[in-house]
Regions:
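N-terminal intrinsically disordered/low-complexity leader segments
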Residues: 1-17, 192-210
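Basic, helix-initiating cap at the start of DNA-binding domains
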Residues: 1-33, 37-49, 66
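Append "Primarily bacterial transcriptional regulators
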Residues: 42-45, 54, 93
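Short hydrophobic/aromatic patch on the recognition helix
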Residues: 49-58
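Hydrophobic alpha-helical connector segments
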Residues: 74-114, 118
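Amphipathic alpha-helical packing segments from all-alpha helical-bundle domains
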Residues: 121-147, 152-160, 168
Length: 210
């Protein structure tokens, strides 16, 4: 059936569009009325779909806040995989994040942060999502440059340090404005100065003290 690949592609695109619609509607309602005050039924109604469809995409209401983390993590993985082998690791991370963040809608990111800031009950799950999804992507990349498994101590530490800088930069951007990609990449320069940009420095980090 020659039309089957096209049909599969169309179904995948429709599914992606529904996910994006549900996420956008939910974030708007969460910001306007508060996370706890919004029901799944209301999100589905605003998105012109059914509650059953909502649960097909999200096991629970707070899983809507994980979509951005998952989307970013996959985009970051792709960008880092395309990094030149001779590019310093933190330079690669800055470039990759700059590309990923520049492609996002700043308004949607601001709504996402606004909801999280206003809802302490979801903060733990969001931080957990970042720890479980985004940081391992960075850890695998750092590990590949250091000749270590991604879950080894040094790559994990570096990923956690970078993750902390990135989250802090998001908060600063939310409070002070400006360009998110520029704020994040500028903040990562603190780590870059601390760990150096040359491969030799990273080799010493991986090998530990003599």
């Amino acid at each position: 059936m020659p039309d089957q690949p096209l049909a599969v592609e169309l179904r995948a695109r429709r599914s992606e569009m529904m996910l994006e619609t549900l996420e956008a509607v939910a974030l708007r309602l969460f910001e306007q009325r508060g996370f706890s005050a919004v029901t799944v039924d209301e999100i589905a109604m605003e998105a012109h779909t059914s509650t059953r469809t909502f649960y097909r995409y999200f096991p629970a209401k707070d899983d809507v806040l994980q979509v951005m983390i998952e989307r970013r993590s996959e985009a970051l993985r792709v960008e880092l995989a395309a990094s030149p082998d001779d590019e310093p690791p933190l330079a690669s991370l800055k470039r990759a994040l700059g590309s990923v963040l520049s492609a996002e809608d700043p308004g949607a990111v601001r709504r996402w942060i606004s909801v999280i800031q206003a809802t302490p009950s979801v903060l733990r799950s969001v931080v957990g999502g970042i720890t479980l999804k985004s940081q391992p992507v960075m850890g695998e990349f750092f590990g590949s440059r250091l000749g270590l498994p991604g879950d080894a101590l040094v790559p994990t530490m570096l990923a956690a340090a970078a993750g902390g800088v990135i989250m802090t930069a998001h908060t600063q951007w939310f409070l002070l404005g400006g360009d998110l990609a520029d704020t994040v990449t500028s903040s990562l320069e603190v780590l870059e100065r601390g760990f150096g940009t040359h491969t030799g420095v990273w080799t010493e980090v991986a090998e530990g003290p003599a």
